[in-house]
Amino acid sequence: MSGRRSFFASKKPSRSSNPFDSDSDDGGREQRPARASSVPPPADQRGSLFGGGDGFSASSAAARSRYRNDFRDTGGVEAQSVQELEGYAAYKAEETTQRVQGCVRIAEEMRDTASKSLVTIHQQGQQITRTHMMTLDIDQDLSRSEKLLGDLGGIFSKKWKPKKNGEIRGPMLTRDDSFIRKGSHLEQRHKLGLSDHPPQSNARQFHSEPTSALQKVEMEKAKQDDGLSDLSNILTELKGMAVDMGTEIDRQTKALGDSEKDYDELNFRIKGANTRARRLLGK
């Protein structure tokens, strides 16, 4: 009996053969390596691969390097796994989004420059109108001076009459009221230091990060659609501003031609009045 007791006492239960043991009691059991080629990486690792996560690692940098040169160093696109191609598609989608957003920024800079040009043209039109209006005041003063010069002289002298080639008409063209209002509005915003165009508010908001490459591609496509929509709206604004500025420049060119005629007429009459005054002083 003692031999049997010693036999049962010396025999220890095997942990490796008990299927009900916990995973923590596996002891020195050999672990089988996981197959990385058939299982997609976790969400945080994929997020770092796309540049959206905080854990940007050397592996993600290496992946971006492969995507950047289109797998030229690793056998080309045809030799890549489905997982690599999914990451490549997400990378290209993100790259396209960045290019679209770059085009939008360039268009916004062009719109800001066009807004400043519109304000400058508006101020130039105001200056042309004010300067031409002054010819009417000069004409009134000159007419009184010519009348006094004609009354001066001896009793038997021939009465002097000023020579005129035409009438001083002043501004004949009326400026476009819509352009004046638009230019005045932009000018006031510039003085107040306000932005000419508020940022677009119709862009879609994404509250969660994508958990797969396909979701990343779809999100980037949505961003591209928003960017292209903004770009189309800005280009439409630029086209309208270009038409307005072209019409205003043509109107100002015609106004300058009319004002030049009045300036030449005033110059001719002033020369005649000066000649009359010198003759009176020489007597």
Swiss-Prot record:
More details: Plants overexpressing SNAP32 exhibit enhanced resistance to the fungal pathogen Magnaporthe oryzae. Plants silencing SNAP32 exhibit increased susceptibility to the fungal pathogen Magnaporthe oryzae.
Quaternary state and interactors: Interacts with SYP121.
GO terms, molecular function: SNAP receptor activity
Role, per record: t-SNARE involved in diverse vesicle trafficking and membrane fusion processes. May be involved in resistance to the rice blast fungus Magnaporthe oryzae. May contribute to host resistance to rice blast through interaction with SYP121.
UniProt source species: Oryza sativa subsp. japonica (Rice)
Keyword Membrane: yes
Subcellular location as annotated: Membrane
Family matches, as InterPro entries: NPSN/SNAP25-like_N_SNARE, T_SNARE_dom
One CC-aspect GO term: plasma membrane
Record family assignment: Belongs to the SNAP-25 family.
Matches recorded under CDD domains: SNARE_Qc (cd15841), SNARE_SNAP25N_23N_29N_SEC9N (cd15861)
Protein name: SNAP25 homologous protein SNAP32
